[in-house]
Structures are given as structure tokens and as C-alpha cells.
């Protein structure tokens, strides 16, 4: 995404100006709340930990698998296993597909799949914070403290990329870094007290 955007920005005569719209905070997304204000979240080998304790996975959680099928999936099998046309659109008998644990077991037991392997995600580039250089992935992420109203954190250049967006965008502060020092509203600081509570939302499709 980043490389593509940079290429387009550098070739405006060919692609034209980039036009954006303000983010609509009223847009609705259905996600599961897995982290509350003041909690510390970490993902280790795809399992979510809250304050150091493993979180029970939803029964219908999905992960992406690489499949080699012995046959094309019939419509009734897809419906039974909760596989949609969008999931299978690019798959003939070989490819990637999000599946529940139940679907994986059924495909194996019925001999429909010759091989199923979990797709392990080592991509660091499309992970929040994008400019953090923290080497986090979807499978192994954090730990990250979820801000709580009235709670303070020590701000450093290392953790600033994590909290820069809520401090600047959601809480309306001017934030700058000058000569290795952090300034909020033109005042040098090493701490910040949050004005709002934040929540960690995550979908059941964790591909």
C-alpha cells in the first residue's frame, strides 16, 4: 500500500491529484471487543493475551490456510462449513482460504483436502503503527497498553508511534518532535494523560 501510494504521488501527471474525504466516524463495523481501557494486550502465535492471560477464542474464529483440494467444493458443503463465494472466488483446487477450526477438520476427515497448512503471517509492513518499526505481525503483536481516561503514560520516541494518533487525532492536540524531544501543544513533555477511554476491537476473521 505504502509503496503504491508513493509511486502515484510521484507521478501526478499520469495519475492526477489524490483526492481524499474526511473519515466518517459514523461508519459501522461489526467487531468483537477484546480489550478494555487500561488493559495490556498481546498476541502470541495468534492467541490474544489480556494482562498476561490467554483469551478464549470465539468458536467461529477464522484463520487463513493454504489448501490443496482433491475436488471443487460443492454448494451444500460450502454452506454447511460456512464458506462463502467470496472466500472461494480465487480458489480452484489450490490457494488460500479463511477457515474455522471446524471447517479444517471436516475438510480433512472427508478427504476433500489433500493438504491444509496454516498461513503464518510474517508481514510487518501493514501493521499498526505503520511508522513504528516495532517488528510486530498479525500473529505476534505487542504488548500494547490500551489507553484509559485519566491514566498517564511515559512518552518516549519508542512508544510515540503507538499513541501519536489518539493524542493528535482523537484528542485534538498539536504534537511535534524536535531535536529528539516531544512537544504537545508547544510544551516539551515526557508524559501524557488521556482524555478518553479506548477499546481494542478485532474481527473473528483473523487472516
Which residues does each predicted region cover?
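Extended hydrophobic leader/signal-anchor segments used for secretion and membrane insertion
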Residues: 1-207
Amino acid at each position: 500500500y505504502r509503496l503504491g501510494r508513493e509511486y502515484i504521488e510521484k507521478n501526478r501527471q499520469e495519475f492526477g491529484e489524490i483526492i481524499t474525504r474526511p473519515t466518517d466516524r459514523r461508519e459501522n463495523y461489526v467487531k468483537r471487543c477484546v480489550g478494555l481501557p487500561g488493559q495490556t494486550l498481546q498476541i502470541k502465535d495468534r492467541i490474544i493475551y489480556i494482562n498476561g492471560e490467554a483469551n478464549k477464542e470465539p468458536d467461529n474464529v477464522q484463520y487463513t490456510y493454504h489448501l490443496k483440494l482433491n475436488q471443487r467444493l460443492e454448494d451444500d458443503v460450502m454452506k454447511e462449513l460456512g464458506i462463502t463465494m467470496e472466500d472461494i472466488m480465487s480458489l480452484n483446487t489450490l490457494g488460500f482460504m479463511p477457515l474455522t477450526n471446524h471447517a479444517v477438520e471436516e475438510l480433512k476427515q472427508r478427504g476433500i483436502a489433500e493438504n491444509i497448512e496454516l498461513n503464518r503471517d510474517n508481514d510487518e509492513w501493514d501493521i499498526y503503527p505503520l511508522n513504528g518499526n516495532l517488528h510486530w505481525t498479525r500473529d505476534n503483536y505487542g504488548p500494547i497498553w490500551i489507553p484509559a481516561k485519566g491514566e498517564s503514560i511515559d512518552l518516549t520516541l519508542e512508544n510515540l508511534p503507538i499513541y501519536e494518533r489518539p493524542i493528535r487525532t482523537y484528542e485534538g492536540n498539536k504534537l511535534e518532535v524536535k531535536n529528539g524531544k516531544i512537544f504537545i501543544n508547544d510544551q516539551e513533555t515526557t508524559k501524557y494523560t488521556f482524555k478518553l477511554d479506548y477499546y481494542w476491537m478485532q474481527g473473528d476473521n483473523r487472516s
